[in-house]
UniProtKB/Swiss-Prot annotation:
EC assignment: 5.3.1.23
Source organism phylogeny: Bacteria, Pseudomonadati, Pseudomonadota, Alphaproteobacteria, Hyphomicrobiales
Function: Catalyzes the interconversion of methylthioribose-1-phosphate (MTR-1-P) into methylthioribulose-1-phosphate (MTRu-1-P).
Organism: Methylorubrum populi (strain ATCC BAA-705 / NCIMB 13946 / BJ001) (Methylobacterium populi)
HAMAP family tied to this protein: Salvage_MtnA (MF_01678)
Pfam families: IF-2B (PF01008)
Catalysis performed (reactions): 5-(methylsulfanyl)-alpha-D-ribose 1-phosphate = 5-(methylsulfanyl)-D-ribulose 1-phosphate
Active site: 242
Protein name per Swiss-Prot or TrEMBL: Methylthioribose-1-phosphate isomerase
Site (Transition state stabilizer): 162
One of the GO BP terms on file: L-methionine salvage from methylthioadenosine
Family (UniProt): Belongs to the eIF-2B alpha/beta/delta subunits family. MtnA subfamily.
Gene Ontology molecular function, alphabetical: S-methyl-5-thioribose-1-phosphate isomerase activity
Record carries keyword Amino-acid biosynthesis: yes
Binding site for substrate: 53-55, 90, 201, 252-253
Length: 365
């Protein structure tokens, strides 16, 4: 996507494979800064501290992190150590494990002397595949928005939660890709952007993206979505996913489940947009089996923003001494999901629906 007319991806390698550059998302929306990752530790810290975030981008960053590690130690033990370090950074997003498993499998088949170069080639392939998948998700999802616009005879009001745009992937995004494709095709679209506490990824990141692309949008408080649905102001909900089970349960940013409940109660379609790499084919019951990351209490107790004089400040917003819980994700049961928008098309959030799009998985099972 473009920032001030210049095309950017969220991650890109330096010539020669000595490092990769990422957009530092902890500085957005008030400062657009690039950060250089030159080692395994740099990549792991970037993932853990959410300099990069979003399931697909986490996976690609991990792939490049493993490639950086191969410059120092390309042995079997080196592969194992690097993969373990990266896997420990964020437990919920399945793309992380998927990318590491793919990288390790490719590297183990190659002679040790060839692994460093091969690792960067494979990481770049994963990045390119992510871009293609997200673009395809956008095409499939845009058809849904176009149909709603024709039926309604006016702008489509989309509600989204957290950030599942190009900042969460290499480019285009998942949940926002249909919005970008539809907008670029002339379909009138307006987006309600949940602020998405505690890290405000909707207000900070999704609004930043939509502003940059010229998409009409309104930032709302997290608890406003149900009210808007009750009063007919939302036509469709589209969210991303950090892990989707083989049965169609969708794990996404905390608060997604509540939006799905409100959408169901008001008969509003609720879609999750995700690439193949987000599907965990080993799990059937997402509520029971998906590990939910518990993050630092300071994300809840403190807020960081820009003051009127342009300085950045962090302030406390919770009564001192109050205990805090900070689960980062929740799981929306498949029964509340109208459909899954993938790079291969749209399907029901069921085992049969996913198997119809990915028949090779059924054969593998």
């Amino acid at each position: 996507m473009k920032i001030d007319g210049r095309p950017y991806r969220t991650i890109f390698p330096e010539a020669g494979g000595n490092a990769v550059t990422v957009i530092d998302q902890t500085r957005l929306p008030f400062a657009f800064e690039l950060k250089r990752l030159a080692s395994l530790d740099d990549a792991a810290v970037a993932i853990r501290t959410m300099v990069v975030r979003g399931a697909p981008l986490i996976g690609v960053t991990a792939a490049y992190g493993l490639a950086l590690a191969m410059r120092e130690d390309a042995s079997e033990a080196g592969i194992e150590r690097a993969a373990a370090t990266l896997a420990a950074t964020r437990p919920t997003a399945i793309n992380l494990r998927w990318a590491l498993d793919r990288m390790a499998a490719v590297l183990r088949r190659a002679p040790e002397a060839e692994r460093a170069a091969l690792a960067f080639t494979e990481a770049a392939s994963i990045a390119e595949e992510d871009v293609a998948s997200c673009r395809a998700i956008g095409e499939h999802g845009a058809r849904i928005l176009a149909e709603i616009a024709v039926k309604k005879g006016g702008p489509v009001n989309v509600l989204t939660h957290c950030n599942a745009g190009w900042l969460a992937t290499v480019d285009w995004g998942t949940a926002l890709a249909p919005i970008y494709v539809a907008h670029d095709a002339g379909v009138p679209v307006h987006v309600f952007v949940d602020e998405t506490r505690p890290r405000n990824q909707g207000a900070a990141l999704t609004a930043f993206e939509l502003n940059a692309h010229g998409v009409p949008h309104t930032v709302i408080a997290d608890n406003a979505g149900g009210h808007l649905m009750q009063h007919g102001q939302v036509d469709v909900c589209i969210v991303g996913s950090d892990r989707t089970t083989a049965a169609g349960d969708v794990c996404n940013k905390i608060g997604t489940y509540l939006k799905a409940l409100a959408a169901s109660d008001n008969r509003i379609p609720f879609y999750a947009a995700l690439p193949f790499s987000t599907i965990d084919w080993t799990l059937a019951d997402g509520v029971r089996d998906i590990p939910i990351e518990e993050r630092d209490a300071r994300e809840v107790t403190h807020l960081t923003g820009r003051t009127d004089d342009g300085a950045f400040a962090t302030v406390a917003v919770v009564s001192p001494g109050s205990p805090v819980a900070n689960p980062a994700f929740d799981v929306t049961p498949a029964r509340l999901v109208t459909g899954l928008i993938t790079e291969r098309g749209v399907c029901a959030a069921t085992e049969e629906g996913l198997a119809g799009l990915y028949p090779e998985r059924r054969k593998a099972a």
